[in-house]
Amino acid sequence: MRLLLDTNVVLDVLLARSPFDEDGATVMSAVETGLAEGFLCATTVTTIHYLTAKAVGRKTAEKHVASLLRIFQIAPVTGAILSSALVSNAKDIEDAVLLESGRAVSIDAIVTSDPFDFKKTLGISIHKPADILRILGV
């Protein structure tokens, strides 16, 4: 299964934001062990670095990003993806970019701590980490 992790799931894990961090960490482990194919949107990587550097320092943020780049594939953000996101009628441009970026790499699902932010979309399911773990049989 091809999964795109929302920025909030990764931040939950890296910043130990309870109660969401445990399920998110298990999803990331499932990707790392090959149980699922994992993707991060390119914008997620820069956001993760920025926010974790503010919280835990630049060196730690760089280590986190390096680790993520070893585990996950990166879904691109191009001009066409940004244009599609702008005309998507989504209430949040960040979520629209994640969705369109994931669509470009044929993801099956988005894993997010807040599934209500994403509108219903054809072909891509939206799941909380605990739900995707059940689907994966973890």
Report each predicted region and the residues it spans.
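Ser/Thr-centric signal marking residues that sit
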Residues: 7, 44, 112
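Short, conserved alpha-helical segments within structured domains
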Residues: 40-44, 81
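Short acidic-hydrophobic, aromatic-tinged amphipathic segments that line or gate anion-handling sites
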Residues: 75-77, 126-129
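Active-site neighborhoods of divalent-metal-dependent phosphate/nucleic-acid chemistry enzymes
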Residues: 70-116
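Short, well-structured N-terminal submotif of metal-dependent ribonuclease cores
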Residues: 1-40, 53-63, 120, 127-138
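Short, well-structured alpha-helical segments
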Residues: 62-66, 82-83
